């Protein structure tokens, strides 16, 4: 998302704006409305056979930045494209796993128990995926009580964790590459004019 880290990247680029003819910064994965549709399609087409008929919960990082709203927008886009029961919960954002569990139990598609798939909505599956999401479950042990899997289990569900970052899906990588192609084309066009040195953003 276009959150804290991405804005730090842009600020860092500004410091060197005068040292190069041009600096180009491509868009984050979710920067424009079309990105949500593209990522929804890329993710669901990559996951649908694995998910089957079971509910899917994607674990995002979350942020105190206003871009935290991107997770709710991404969930809406996924549901609209997949026509499936999909949720996004975050580790450090406003949408918690408790919020999702409450929705699962009280919504129109309410499920009181049963299998639920947990998959990271992060580029790589690292510490958050292994600990905050799976809580040691991938090692054949009972999940930690404060992990996503542990809280789902305590609520009566049967969580199944997939330790795989979204960067492992070729269709998602293609969205990143499309952003790179866009900014490269923009950079080339800008360099053929008489523009002064500066920074180009996707």
Can you describe what each PLM-predicted range is?
Residues 1-202:
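Extended amphipathic ligand-handling, pore-lining, and cofactor/metal-binding catalytic surfaces
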